[in-house]
Amino acid sequence: MRVGKMSLTLLISLLSWQCMIESRAVGNDGYGLWLSCSFPDQSLLSEYQDKITSVVVIGNSRTCEIIRDELNAGLTSLLGKIEIMPESRLNECDLIIGPASAVTNLNELISPELPVDLGPEGFMISSLRIGERESILISANTEIGCLYGSFHFLRLLQVGQSLTQIHLVSRPRIQYRLLNHWDNLNGRVERGYAGRSLWKWEELPDSIDSRYRDYARANASIGINGTVLNNVNADPRILRADYLRKVAALADAFRPYGIRVFLSVNFSSPISAEFEVNRNRHGGIGTLSESDPLNPEVRKWWKEKAVEIYKLIPDFGGFLVKANSEGMPGPLDYGRSHADGANMLAEALAPYGGVVMWRSFVYNADVDPDRAKRAYLDFVPLDGRFAKNVFVQSKNGPVDFQPREPVAPIFGGMPYTPLMLELQITQEYLGHSTHLVYLGSMWKEYLEFDTFARGEGSTLASVIDGTLHHSPMTGIAGVTNIGDNRNWTGHFFAQANWYAFGRLAWDHALSAEQIAGEWIRQSLGQDPVMVEKVTSMMMGSWEACVNYMTPLGLHHIMQEGFHYGPQPSLERAPRKDWTSVYYHRADSLGLGFDRSSNGSDAVGQYFSPLSEQFDSLRICPEKYLLWFHHVPWDYTMKSGRTLWQSLCDHYYSGTDYVNGMIETWAELKNKIDPEVYQHVSEKLKQQQKDASIWRDTCLNYFQEFSRMKIVNVQTE
C-alpha cells in the first residue's frame, strides 16, 4: 500500500514539474520565487550528479510527502535525474532524510549523533558511510526540522557548496519567526502594494486555494514558522465562529509546513455592537457593555473564546494586539495599564501554550511633546509586570519604519520582558513596490546596533535572541509585502526582502551580502558577472534610498497618508506629529529636531556611552545628525563641507546611484530572463523619476530657509 501511495505522489510531482518547466519556457513571471531550482552551480554540477542519484525519505506523514516532493522536483531540475527509493532500500541511497530516531530504527548501523541543543527545528546535514557506500544524511529531532534541512540542501546546490565530507548543523536563533499580514477582511491590504489579500475569506473553509500551500512552502523554505493573518487594526469579526472555521482551514493547510497561525484581535471584541458607533474600530461581537480587563465577565469571555479557538486549532499561536494607538481601543480606556490588558489575554491563552504580542506602537501626545519618546515612557515603567507568555512587540525605530532611524531605546530598556522586534518588509516609506531597495542591509544595521544595555556588545540581536537578558521566549516579526499579484510582491526584487527577512530571522549572523547572493543565484542565475553586479546594485540600494529621501537623519517628510513621494512642506494634519514640519523643524538658522539634553532629551533614553555620543553635535554619527540635533546651515561636517552642501551632496548621490543601477541593469540584458529584465527596467525608470522628484522637491523647499545655492559636488 505504501509503494502505491508513493507512486501516486511521484506521478503528481512529475506532472507538477512538467507544468513548471512549461511555464518557465514562456518566461519567468516571478510566481516561483526563489524555489524554481533552475540554476545549479555549474562548477560543481558533476560532483552533485555523481554523489546524488537516489533519495529515501523516512516516514509517511504529510510533511514527509512534502519533503519527498520537494527533493524529487528540485533534484530532478538541478541534476537531471533522481530516483526516489522506498525505505527498504535505505542502504542503497545517496541521500537519506529522516528524524534521527526513525533512521536508527531502520538501520542500527546509522545512529546520528545530533547536537544536544538542536531543538525541535534545527537540522544536521552530514556525510556518512554505510558499508562501502558514502551517503549524505539530513536529520533532525522532528520532521519539520528535516523539512528545513531539505530546503537548505537544495539551496546549497545552488550556491556552490561542496558535498565532499560535508558536516553542517543549523538551528534557529529565534523561536517565533512570524509574518504579520495587515490584511483586512474585505480583501484590502493596509500598506500593501502587491494586489489584494491572499486570503479568500468568502471561499473558505470549503475551498483551499493552491496558492495557500505555495505560500506555506515559500515560508518554510526560509524558516518562517508563523503567520498573523489579519490587520492589527483588527475587525472583531475575525473571532466569530464562522471566521474561526475559515482560520482553522488555513491552519490545516499550513501545519505540515511547520507554520502556526496567529490572529490580530480587537480589544473591544467582547462588547456588543450596540454600545459602539464605529463597529469595525471599536465595537465587538459579544454581549458585554465594556471590555475592562479587570472585569470578571470580560476575562471570562476571553477564556471561553480561547476554548473555542483551540478546539478548532490545537496549535493556535496566539494574539497580536494594537491597543490605545491611532484610535484602537485598549485598557487605557478604563484607566488600566498595557500590562493589565496583555495579562488578561495571556491568562486565557496560557493553558494552551499561546502567546500575546502586545505592540508598543503608541504615541499619545499627552505623554511627551516628542513622539519619539512616548513608547519608552509608556512601557519601560511596566517592565517585569507582564505575564510570562507576553511579548512586547516594538518597531525597530522610535517613530515609524522610516528609511533610517536609530534603534528604539525600548530595546535593552526592558530586561525582564521578552521583546519581539517588528520589521517592515513592505516598503511603506521606501518607495512601495516601485523602488528597488534591498532591506537586508538596513536590517543588519539595526541588528548590529549596540545598545550598551549591559556594556559593549549588547546588540539589538542579542536582545531579541534572548542571550543578553536570558529571555524565556524570543521573537521577530515582519510586516509582509505579499499580495495576490502573480509575482507575490509587486516588484521582482521585493521578493529578496521576504527572503532576507526569513534568513535573518533564522540566523541573524548571516551577512546581508551572503543573503543577497543566495537569492540572486536561486532567482536569476549563476552567471558570475551577473551575480557580482546585481549584488552590488542591491547592497547599495538602501543607502541610496536614504540619500534621495531622508539623508543625515531627516525623517517623516513624505506625502500625507500615502507615504510615497516627498512633502516637506506639510504643516497641517489631524495631528501635529503627522506633519513634516514637526520633524524637520527647518528655519533660517538650521535644520533638524533637537533631541539633545538641551532639547527634548530623547538622548537620555539611551545607555551610556550612546547617550553622550548622540548628545554631542561634534561626535554624533552624521547618519543620525538631524534626528538628534537642530544644526546650523553653515555647520562644518566631517567632510569639511557645510551642512547645506552635505545635504545637497547626499541628495545627488542618491539619484546618481539610481542612474547607475539603470546602467548596470542594461548591461545585463542578455544575462537575465527577458520577462524579468523588462519588468525591472520599467520599475527602475520610475524610480529614477521619483528619486529626482524627491531630491528637487526637498532641496528647493529647504533652500527657502538656508538661502544658499543648490550645489552638486560632482559638477562644482
Residue ranges and their predicted role:
Residues 458-716:
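Catalytic domains of carbohydrate-active enzymes that cleave complex glycans
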Residues 1-5:
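Positively charged n-region of N-terminal signal peptides that target proteins for export
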Residues 60-70, 74, 111-318, 350, ...:
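Feature activates predominantly on carbohydrate-active enzymes
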Residues 21-133, 163-165:
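Acidic, contiguous N-terminal accessory segments
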Residues 7-18:
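Bacterial N-terminal signal peptides
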Residues 48-49, 88-89, 129-132, 171-173, ...:
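Extracellular/periplasmic catalytic domains that process cell-envelope and extracellular macromolecules
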Residues 56-61, 96-102, 139-141, 183, ...:
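Structural motif
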Residues 203, 278, 286-517, 523-527:
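Catalytic-core regions of glycoside hydrolase
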